[in-house]
């Protein structure tokens, strides 16, 4: 499989050892304690890059700066690690890094699935998107987006046993 992740410390380690080098460390889980623990990796550095990534579907001048990039392999999983946040649903980072995602069995992206369908149309068959049910804005369960306190309650879909009604 292949995925993207922001982790400046892992990128730094990758740049220290260079392409072909081996890095050990804890990947991810460093922003907060809501999205899981870091995982221990023992990875080989496959590629290093430092450029802005063209935004898919935008004009030719639109770019996103994700900082330095390290492409690593951990147990057969290709991980694109960036220094800054990378909005994978809005950009073609894999194409820009010459990573052919069509050869992978799984492509792990966290974000808005409708945006994925646009960006990856023709690459990933329609209906083959698995929507991650994680905390925050990316969850299909809006109750996980946070605590809603300034709205009339009970309300669908935030409260149980409340039917949807259009007003």
Show where each model-derived region lies.
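Hard-cation-handling environments
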Residues: 1-84
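Extended hydrophobic packing segments that form well-structured cores
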Residues: 53-167
